[in-house]
Structures are given as structure tokens and as C-alpha cells.
Amino acid sequence: MRNRILFLFCLLSLFGGCGFQEPTQWKEWRDQFVLKDNPEGTISISEAITHSGGDEILIMAQVGGGKGDTFDNKVASFLVSEAPDKEHLGKPGHDPDGCPFCKQKLANAPTVTVGFETNDGKAIPVDARKLFGIKKGDVVVIKGKGSYEESTKMLTLNATGMHVVSR
């Protein structure tokens, strides 16, 4: 009996510390990219397309949009589309997916690919959902430099900061 208890104790000691421990690099990236305060002066994605000549821009957008997957599960990259109008944003009981005005606006809205890079210019190798705790439908403010590709009608934003406005 004593041997069984000793064996069980050893087994529990061995597996007790096997939980997932987040790499310290993730915290460093969060500290680098997560904006504590909601920045002022955001523009729409449509406006950002005309200002995407290499200058830093600040957009308010909704995570998700376009066809296909919103997130890349290998790197910190995701799609965003136009955020709901400010008068609709955060209204109790408002469902942008069921609102005819929001649906009409979003139907033809451009999509943006947002990516986060390391200091040496490589894509951060962590799913943005894990790194930043975001999900489809969140409204975010993204700060970064953009480039617009006319052939794909896609704005690509190399993000330097992000603030989650609403979940």
C-alpha cells in the first residue's frame, strides 16, 4: 500500500507541471504592439486605401471579412473589414449581422490583411487569436503602414499597434 501511495505521489509530481506555459516572447510582442489607449483620428478602410502610399495610417475595423478564413493559424495575421458605423457600435442589443444598414455597408466594403512582424521583418509565428486574444467580430483600431494592390482590391497593413475597442 505504501509503495502505491509513493508511486502515485511521484506520478503526480511528474505531471503536475505539464500545463502550457506561454513563451516570454509573446509578452514582449504584446508589449510592443498592444496600444493601451484607444487612439484618436481613425479613418475608414476606404479612406486608408487613398492614403496607403507608405505613410502611417490609423483605421478602425472589424475582425473578419471577405471569403475564407479570417485568421492564419501559423502567423499573427488576419483579415478585417469596415467597422460598424460609430452610431451603431456598442449599442445594446444591436446585431450588425442582422442590421440591414450594416449589412449593406459591409457587402461591398474592402478587406484588409493585417500582419505583425518581428523587428527583423519576419511574420510573428503565432496565431493572432492566441497572441492578442482577438476573435472574429471584435472591433479594433490598427496602426501601421499600408499598401494597396489594385489587382486584388486588397489593402495590406504592416501593423505597428493595435487596440481592441469592443468584443
Predicted feature residues:
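Sec-dependent bacterial lipoprotein signal peptides
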Residues: 1-18
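OB-fold and OB-like single-stranded nucleic-acid-recognition modules
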Residues: 18-167
